Amino acid sequence: MKRQGLNRRQFIRNSTLLAGTALLSSWALPGVCGAAAQTGKRTAVDQVMLGKTGIKLSRLGFGAGSDNGHIQTAIGKDGFNKLIHYAYDQGITYFDTSQTYATFTWIGDAIKGLPREKLFIQSKISGKPGDVLATIDNHRKTFNTDYIDSMLVHCMTRGAWTDEWKRVMDAFNEAKEKKWIRAKGVSCHSLPALRAATASDWTEVHLVRVNPQGSYTDGEVADWSGSIHHDISPVIQEIKTTHAKGRGVIGMKIFGNGTFTDPADREKSIRFAMACKEIDAVVIGFKSGGEIDEAIERVNRALAEA
């Protein structure tokens, strides 16, 4: 696996050097994203602070939900376990899942043997479970852990979600008091939902769809097809506002829900995210060590040139 990664890195250096240079003038959207501060050498696997939550995680996270996790389950449970450990060996400590992902029941075994105190595990709850606390407790039991670092209300699309999901949100508050979860937040899939998340004092962590191409990002109406490329500026404005409130911001859909098959698109998106100081971390779905190696190299290069 190491050899595969080295070959991948050599390929990326040779094939994207000129492309990366050409993109320097095109990856940023003027006036929408704050420039990242220069603080010495930064890398994909730095431990970064998630807003003002007091929680640290690796800048690059491992997403276990590509195509609702079916991309990951296709490599088999043993392959998945090895891939999680490979990611950790490279310095990735942030692992992202959900009760709706096919990988959900695999996470506990996958992280077995890894130091729990060094991991950041984020999970999500969809819908409105009848017993929210029991659902959160099931996460703990499934992952063989006493606590979940970040628990999100998953896939909000309505601007009124903060009213409609109040019972669920109250249960999250109780779970945090019980120390079952360390932070609480939301993943949004429309601009109305994202604006509501920004306005709500309840939210501590925001999982936001972001890429400069506007692919699979938030618009006024929730869209699952990816056929509409949205103006990313309103999303960035919400990110800036929520960051200013001390919230944690994690970028998702960095590779356009896996549709960025052109390396230039992946490079452009990574550079955009790494140049944006309001984004604390990003999460990308992986199915191979080579993909992890590529993402780390792209992030490292983008940070060095930001």
Describe the function of each predicted region.
Residues 155-306:
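Beta/alpha (TIM)-barrel catalytic core signal, keyed to glycine-rich beta->alpha loops juxtaposed to Asp/Glu
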Residues 74-87, 130-142, 190-195, 265-272:
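Short, acidic/polar
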Residues 143-159:
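Active-site groove signature of glycoside hydrolases
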Residues 52-54, 108-116, 139-146, 198-201, ...:
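Acidic (Asp/Glu)-rich catalytic clusters
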Residues 65-77, 122-130, 260-262:
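Active-site mouth loops of central-metabolism enzymes
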Residues 1-22:
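N-terminal secretory signal peptides and thylakoid transit peptides that target proteins
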